[in-house]
């Protein structure tokens, strides 16, 4: 027999969701009602945490991993899910995984945001992981608004929609034994749920519904970045294997606010940030791409030297890209760079500039994804 949890206080694990959230929910309910999922993605919202707050905008059914109904959650109340032995605990329920399914086209609450779709909570490591199970097209309403600027021309937002759809599908098809397809960060694609949905992103996603970039009949690895600094890169020059559709091309991103940038460091500050070399005496690129992007850097200090990768360099020095030059003067190192991101695939600011000049999204995509074709998704996508 099922039981419905009401607003009674269950220790500190039950709380009333913010009343203002109803304004957001009503607005998006009027804009578009969710449709039944055709391709469902698994988005990791929280991974291996000690507790995660979950809820629903409407009454919701709680099921175990086998689909058995365990009970119901009352609308607009949040519960904390946490580890219980080898299971997940949520109020009086306990199972290896729990699924929350809103009724009447409701939305799910995970930690501090509203999302479309359903919630799955699983036991992982010493904690629990919360996944948002969401339709691919509805996922894109949020991603396009988080990755691009909603006020951009529709053709730029359409290009972003196709790129993000293709990337998500590629990740889903290659996720293997992972329990999720994508997360919410720049490691995959930024995803903020209803918070980053806009009328313009809905329009762009719907106008390109089901369209992807493909090569040999398969979704491509449709990576993108903010600004290349004038020219994108061949993928093998920055990462590993060559791909026929990720080729370096002229970029049109000169309007980007991140097209040029600079940072200054003292020799002592660099030594502290890099560690193990003492006061820095020189920074010398040991490997660069044909367009000048640093892939490997030699740092020499008064106590030793170190060879670091482009990824480490960006993280340690918080650089927008590794396309830069270095000049030293009286113990100060000036780094003058261009662009923001890895410089491979679609340039978002380049797409903006082209769209602003009247170029259509299909031509934008053809420029940045050489040799790839704009096609329709196949009706069934195997996991």
What are the roles of these predicted feature ranges?
Residues 2-383:
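Conserved, single-site charged/polar hotspot
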């Amino acid at each position: 027999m099922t039981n419905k949890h009401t607003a009674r206080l269950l220790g500190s694990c039950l709380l009333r969701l913010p009343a203002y959230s109803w304004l957001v929910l009503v607005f998006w309910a009027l804009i578009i009602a969710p449709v039944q999922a055709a391709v469902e993605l698994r988005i990791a919202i929280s991974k291996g945490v000690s507790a995660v707050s979950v809820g629903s905008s409407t009454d919701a059914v709680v099921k175990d991993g086998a689909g058995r109904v365990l009970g119901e959650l009352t609308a607009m109340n949040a519960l904390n899910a946490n580890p219980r032995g080898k299971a997940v605990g949520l109020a009086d329920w306990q199972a290896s995984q729990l699924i929350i399914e809103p009724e009447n086209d409701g939305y799910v609450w995970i930690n501090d945001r509203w999302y479309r779709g359903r919630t799955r909570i699983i036991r992982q490591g010493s904690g629990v992981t919360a996944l948002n199970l969401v339709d691919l097209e509805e996922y894109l309403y949020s991603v396009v608004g988080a990755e691009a600027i909603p006020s951009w021309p529709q053709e730029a937002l359409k290009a972003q929609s196709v790129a993000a759809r293709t990337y998500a599908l590629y990740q889903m098809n290659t996720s293997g034994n992972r329990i999720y397809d994508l997360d919410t960060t720049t490691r995959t694609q930024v995803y903020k749920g209803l918070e980053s949905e806009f009328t313009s992103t809905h329009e762009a996603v719907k106008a390109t519904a089901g369209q992807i970039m493909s090569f040999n009949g398969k979704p491509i690895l449709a990576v993108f970045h903010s600004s290349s600094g004038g020219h994108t890169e061949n993928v093998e020059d920055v990462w590993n294997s060559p791909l026929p559709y990720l080729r370096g091309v002229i970029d049109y991103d000169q309007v980007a606010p991140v097209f040029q940038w600079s940072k200054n460091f003292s020799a002592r500050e660099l030594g502290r940030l890099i560690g193990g070399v003492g006061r820095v005496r020189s920074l010398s690129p040991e490997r660069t791409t044909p367009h000048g992007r640093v892939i490997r850097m030699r740092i020499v200090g008064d106590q030793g030297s170190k060879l670091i990768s482009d990824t480490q360099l960006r993280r340690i020095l918080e650089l927008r890209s590794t396309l830069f030059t270095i000049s030293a003067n009286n113990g100060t190192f000036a780094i003058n760079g261009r662009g923001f991101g890895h410089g491979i695939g679609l340039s978002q600011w380049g797409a903006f500039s082209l769209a602003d000049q009247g170029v259509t999204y299909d031509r934008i995509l053809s420029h940045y994804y050489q040799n790839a074709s704009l096609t329709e998704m196949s009706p069934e996508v195997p996991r």
